[in-house]
């Protein structure tokens, strides 16, 4: 069967899309997924006119134009209870490149087209199966490299952040409904405590959202914490980078000033991604290249979440940053002062203690409330916009101005989830009041 023998779809009907759901690397099985109105006709054409039972694994011989393409498992997934909300199917194929290419050719010939990046999830959002926050979480889940990233992405995909923002939006709707009543029915002589209650609720919302903005756990989990190793030349910074990471990423010599530019690599500690940065030795110098390396080192120190400040046996302690952990190095030559952590990268002494201290510091940075944290700059910008309009609403002298600022705050929250709905506001207004009946 070819495309010409399939029933025509209306011009405004989304086209069937397909894509390989598994990776391109060599494997036993490859999963081809498809979605869109008309998926049933395409699957029937491939399965010799027999559509598999919904959501039941079926072994089928796939054919096109009389040619056997593969012996595969077919899954028919009718909407709306599918990932995209549309009719769709999966083909679990043998993963040979020739088979995958031939199946793709057949799907194209039958009227489907290759999906654009993220198009399956985009359709899920458009069909209301996911909101924007959940869609972003799916991307984060696919990209997750650490246990903390996996847990956070899964929590957001399950709707934790969406529920928080929806709760704020619902409370704003109720405030706005009362505010509209004050504007539209001024002769009803509503008690003064009604307006006072509106201001109090706005203050609570503003406090909660402002606290949410201060919580940067989500961004730290997604991007990783920055741990900068700093100190004077030849104090053991590169040796510590290699010891912690278990690599030879940095060149180690007895010559001072070997590291001219920052060397960075990723390291996972307790399921949290850390960005370890080895920096140029800090000292006075006339060398322009070394001076630039030192300038960059100081920049990294200022930006760091944690600074491992290494101090040699003959040095005094000078504080570099409020985030630093002072560490005496080369304790195989001279012991560390009482109360100060000492390490030797030669013998390994003190490295376990350093990992424990660093683990505790990471736990402190990741500690916070039970509320889900924001995870992207888009979320931060949206919440900041909502807070700004709340502040304007709280201090507005005219009821109409307050109402407009509340609408703008709701709009900012709605853009975060993708749920911007005027009808929901009307439902809140007419559902809460019986004035005028």
Curated annotation (Swiss-Prot):
Main location: cytoplasm
Domain TrmE-type G: 224-363
Cofactor, free-text remark: Binds 1 potassium ion per subunit.
Binding site for (6S)-5-formyl-5,6,7,8-tetrahydrofolate: 33, 90, 129, 437
Organism of origin: Gluconobacter oxydans (strain 621H) (Gluconobacter suboxydans)
Complex and partners: Homodimer. Heterotetramer of two MnmE and two MnmG subunits.
Binding-site positions, Mg(2+): 238, 259
A Pfam family this chain is assigned to: TrmE_N
Cofactor(s) this protein cannot do without: K(+)
Presence of keyword DNA repair: no
Subcellular location(s) per record: Cytoplasm
Gene (name only): mnmE
PROSITE patterns with a match to the protein in the record: G_TRME
Gene Ontology CC, one term: cytoplasm
Gene Ontology molecular function, alphabetical: GTP binding; GTPase activity; metal ion binding
Gene Ontology BP term (one): tRNA methylation
Top-level taxon of the source organism: Bacteria
The keyword Hydrolase is assigned to this record: yes
Keyword line: Cytoplasm, GTP-binding, Hydrolase, Magnesium, Metal-binding, Nucleotide-binding, Potassium, tRNA processing
Function: Exhibits a very high intrinsic GTPase hydrolysis rate. Involved in the addition of a carboxymethylaminomethyl (cmnm) group at the wobble position (U34) of certain tRNAs, forming tRNA-cmnm(5)s(2)U34.
Sites where the protein binds GTP: 234-239, 253-259, 278-281
Protein family per UniProt: Belongs to the TRAFAC class TrmE-Era-EngA-EngB-Septin-like GTPase superfamily. TrmE GTPase family.
Name of the protein described by the UniProt record: tRNA modification GTPase MnmE
Enzyme Commission identifier(s): 3.6.-.-
Enzyme class label: hydrolase
């Amino acid at each position: 069967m070819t495309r010409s023998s399939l029933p025509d779809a209306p011009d405004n009907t989304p086209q069937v899309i397909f894509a390989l759901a598994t990776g391109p690397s060599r494997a036993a099985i490859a999963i081809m997924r498809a979605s869109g109105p008309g998926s049933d006709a395409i699957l029937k054409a491939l399965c010799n006119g027999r559509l598999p039972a919904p959501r039941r694994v079926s072994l089928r011989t796939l054919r096109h134009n009389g040619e056997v393409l593969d012996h595969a498992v077919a899954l028919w997934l009718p909407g709306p209870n599918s990932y995209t909300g549309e009719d769709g199917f999966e083909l679990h194929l043998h993963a040979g490149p020739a088979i995958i290419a031939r199946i793709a050719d057949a799907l194209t010939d039958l009227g489907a087209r290759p999906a654009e990046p993220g198009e399956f999830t985009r359709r899920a959002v458009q069909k209301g199966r996911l909101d924007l926050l959940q869609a972003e979480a799916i991307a984060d889940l696919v990209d997750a490299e650490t246990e903390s990233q996996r847990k956070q992405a899964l929590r957001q995909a399950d709707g934790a952040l969406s529920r928080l923002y929806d709760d704020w939006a619902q409370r704003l709707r109720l405030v706005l409904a009362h505010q509209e009543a004050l504007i539209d029915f001024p002769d009803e002589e509503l008690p003064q405590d009604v307006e006072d209650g509106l201001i109090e609720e706005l203050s609570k919302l503003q406090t909660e959202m402002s606290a949410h903005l201060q919580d940067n756990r989500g961004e730290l989990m997604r991007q990783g914490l920055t741990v900068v190793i700093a100190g004077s030349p030849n104090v053991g910074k590169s040796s510590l980078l290699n010891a912690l990471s278990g690599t030879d990423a940095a060149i180690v010599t007895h010559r001072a000033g070997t590291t001219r530019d920052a060397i960075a690599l990723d390291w996972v500690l307790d399921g949290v991604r850390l960005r370890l940065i080895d920096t140029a030795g800090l000292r006075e110098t006339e060398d322009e290249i070394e001076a630039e390396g030192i300038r960059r080192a100081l920049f990294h120190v200022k930006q760091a979440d944690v600074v491992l400040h290494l101090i040699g046996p003959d040095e005094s302690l000078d504080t570099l940053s409020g985030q630093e952990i002072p560490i005496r190095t080369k304790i195989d030559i001279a012991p560390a002062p009482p109360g100060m952590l000492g390490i030797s990268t030669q013998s390994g002494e003190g490295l376990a203690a350093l990992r424990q201290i660093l683990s505790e510091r990471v736990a402190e940075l990741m500690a916070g409330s039970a509320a889900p944290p924001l995870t992207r700059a888009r979320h931060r910008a949206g919440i900041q916009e909502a807070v700004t309009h709340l502040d304007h609403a709280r201090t507005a002298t005219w009821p109409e101005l307050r109402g407009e600022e509340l609408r703008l705050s709701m709009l900012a929250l709605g853009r975060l989830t993708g749920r911007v709905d005027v009808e929901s506001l009307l439902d809140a207004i007419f559902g809460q009041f019986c004035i005028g009946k």
